[in-house]
Design a protein with these regions (language model features):
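Bacterial N-terminal signal peptides
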Residues: 3-15
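An extracytoplasmic/periplasmic, membrane-proximal ligand-sensing/linker region
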Residues: 26-30, 218-221, 225, 247-248, ...
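Hinge/capping helix and adjacent helix->loop/strand transition within the periplasmic-binding protein
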Residues: 30, 55-60, 79-90, 98-196, ...
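Extracytoplasmic "Venus flytrap"
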Residues: 31-47, 70-72, 153-160
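Ligand-binding clamshell of periplasmic/extracellular solute-binding protein-like
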Residues: 45, 49, 71-74, 88-101, ...
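A ligand-binding cleft/hinge motif common to bilobed small-molecule-binding domains
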Residues: 96-108, 162, 166-171, 194, ...
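Short beta-strand->loop
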Residues: 111-122, 175-181, 212-265, 314, ...
């Protein structure tokens, strides 16, 4: 008798669950808040997801992109966390290293990194630091020995353009002056062209994805002095990795641990997040739709045309990583405060 009742109940209520999933997003619009300016590589990845994800969400909602740049995506992250409704209709694309700012206690932070809804990551990419070729800084050793350190440009402390030069100082003794306050990576590149600064750190993927870098490489305007991967990227076979340099300069174990925490941002990559508190069934819908989106044949062709690498990570994996990186002991946090100048 009991099994029969259970079967009847499942038959009666199962369709309504499926119906609710299908109808919630029907005739709705999902807004993807991009924390970087239009045209940046982060923005290109966000728009690519927005273009295709709607067809994999039951109800086929419209998906629009709203750019909200500022302070290395801090403005967008704070907005998604504190203003957007937790209904699954606002998602976002932010830079991956904003957890630094929470760990070191910056007052601008209005979010709890662990409480974001993690939907997925389009790609994992290591970092590089490029240098104008008409400077005397041809190698890391030149930078280490320089009486006057090179100037690198950066948006804010949560951008790789800021923290990678600082990490190189801590781990291998290469000194830099980092000039912050630029609105975007593109603005930093323009500053490099004008001669205001000589260098910038950011992802390998972006360096090989768009202009002006293809033209710069052809003209020899810049060269890459270091990359952060465990092994050399196939596109940069002659550029030393940070692990190689740490071995060469006998970096301490403490500094190697610091590097591991900082470079965890590589694994977070180009994340798509949601507000805290999205109902579990909608989180499931968004995560499943993301995985289907980054496997879509049309999207893969589009990514290839735009020279955008794909190495996706699931929302579940991102959530686990986010929890792990926030569980840092006090000594590591103090080292990060020193590195970030807080």
């Amino acid at each position: 008798m009991v099994p029969s009742i259970l079967i009847l109940l499942s038959v009666l209520f199962w369709p309504f669950g499926g119906y609710a999933q299908t109808t919630f997003y029907k005739d709705k619009t999902i807004r993807l808040v991009a924390g970087t300016p239009a045209g940046s590589v982060y923005d290109l990845y966000a728009r690519m997801v927005a273009q295709f994800i709607g067809k994999y969400i039951p109800g086929n909602p419209n998906v629009i992109v709203q750019n909200m740049p500022g302070v290395a995506s801090m403005v967008a992250a704070n907005y998604i966390y504190t203003v957007a409704k937790p209904d699954g209709l606002t998602i976002g694309s932010i830079q991956p290293a904003l957890y630094f700012d929470q760990l070191v206690g910056r007052k601008e932070v209005q979010f709890d990194w662990k409480k974001f809804t993690w939907i997925g990551n389009t790609t994992v990419s290591d970092y590089l630091l490029y240098m104008r070729s008409d400077t005397p800084y041809k190698t890391v050793e030149d930078i280490r020995k320089a009486a006057v350190p090179p100037k690198c440009g950066a948006e804010g402390t949560g951008s790789s353009a800021y923290y990678l030069p600082r990490l190189l100082e801590e781990t291998i003794g290469a000194k830099f002056t980092v000039v912050t306050g630029y609105n975007s990576g593109t603005d930093v590149d323009l500053a490099v062209e004008r001669g205001e600064v000589q260098c910038r750190a950011f992802t390998i993927a972006a360096f090989f994805a768009r202009e002006p870098f293809a033209t710069w490489r052809k003209k020899g305007f810049v060269h890459v002095v270091v990359q952060t991967g465990k092994k050399r990227d196939a596109k940069l076979p002659d550029t030393p990795t940070l692990p190689e340099l740490m071995d060469r300069y006998k970096t301490t174990e403490s500094n190697r641990r610091l590097a591991a925490v900082i470079l965890a941002a590589n694994e977070i990559g180009r994340p798509i997040i949601g507000t805290p508190g999205i109902p579990a069934d909608r989180v499931k819908i968004l995560r499943e739709a993301f995985i289907k989106t980054v496997s879509d044949a049309e999207l893969l062709d589009d990514a290839k045309r735009k020279r955008l690498d794909l190495d996706p990570v699931s929302g579940e994996e991102l959530e686990k990583l986010g929890n792990e990186i926030m569980a840092q002991p006090p000594d590591v946090i103090e080292r990060m405060k020193k590195l970030l100048g807080t």
